[in-house]
């Protein structure tokens, strides 16, 4: 038997490749985490220091003391509220498209096509509109914008998940005297739960990582963490420790969300892949 065809060798190669891929994806996160605790001397040391010799918690303390950490809370409010609104409206719209054929067969394609428009092409008209209404640097302004941009994606995704739910189950519930709202809450939502969570996670991440709209439409009160990070880049020098610390704070909510919803997320993505 050839050497590479032996079961033990093939298994070792698989584990080796898997380990290499894990290191490639995990190392940048580890390095970012270490930089957030390093002194400037350790950050620019050569050869590089693979870990912080003296952990500088002051990098994080400074963010909270100066109020910069509030930008993470701003991002959480904007992303969280817009995700909830988009999921409620988008799921109901998707249900209407599937069960009542609202707008015909081409409406869903038209809706998702709106999401393909590049944000940079419309950011200036939106800015002028927000100046007119006085929505610049406001929570409700960005929440409305994020919701509007998330709705096409939510409708498209939830349309596919709802189509997989047998119509007979809903008809049986209606025959038993349930209202359409009861059917939604007791039949459709529980059966599409994995799809709901998967869609919500990606919707949340879109709003959480937004930079362009937050940069143009905020000033001082509603700055998000993505915009705040750019304030640490200067013409003469960059505050790399603050950049790393703010980046760590900005990634924690996403990591925690994905960790708690991992089971539903994987199942929801798998359902979509099987359907496709």
Regions found by a protein language model. Give the residues of each.
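A hydrophobic, multi-pass inner-membrane permease signature
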Residues: 1-276
């Amino acid at each position: 038997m050839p050497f590479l065809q032996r079961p033990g060798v093939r298994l070792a190669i698989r584990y080796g490749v898997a380990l290499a891929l894990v290191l490639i994806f995990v190392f940048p996160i580890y390095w970012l985490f270490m930089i957030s605790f390093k002194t400037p001397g350790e950050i620019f040391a050569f050869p590089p220091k693979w870990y912080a010799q003296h952990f500088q918690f002051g990098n994080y303390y400074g963010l909270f003391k100066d109020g910069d950490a509030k930008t993470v809370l701003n991002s959480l409010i904007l992303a969280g509220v817009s995700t909830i609104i988009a999921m409620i409206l988008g799921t109901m719209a998707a249900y209407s498209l599937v069960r009542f054929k609202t707008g015909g067969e081409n409406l869903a394609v038209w809706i998702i096509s709106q999401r393909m428009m590049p944000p940079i092409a419309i950011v200036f008209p939106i800015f002028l509109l927000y100046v007119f209404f006085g929505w610049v640097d406001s929570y409700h302004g960005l929440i409305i914008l994020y919701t509007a941009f998330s709705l096409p994606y939510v409708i498209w995704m939830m349309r596919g998940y709802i189509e997989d739910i047998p119509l007979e189950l809903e008809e049986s519930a209606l025959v038993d005297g349930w209202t359409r709202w009861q059917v939604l809450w007791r039949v459709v939502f529980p059966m599409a739960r994995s799809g709901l969570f998967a869609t919500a996670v990606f919707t949340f991440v879109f709003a959480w990582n937004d930079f362009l709209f937050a940069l143009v439409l905020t000033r001082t009160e509603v700055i998000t963490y993505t915009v705040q990070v750019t304030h640490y880049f200067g013409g003469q020098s960059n505050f790399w420790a603050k950049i790393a610390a703010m980046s760590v704070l900005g990634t924690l909510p996403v990591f925690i969300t994905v960790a708690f919803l991992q089971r539903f997320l994987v199942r929801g993505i798998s359902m979509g892949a099987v359907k496709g």
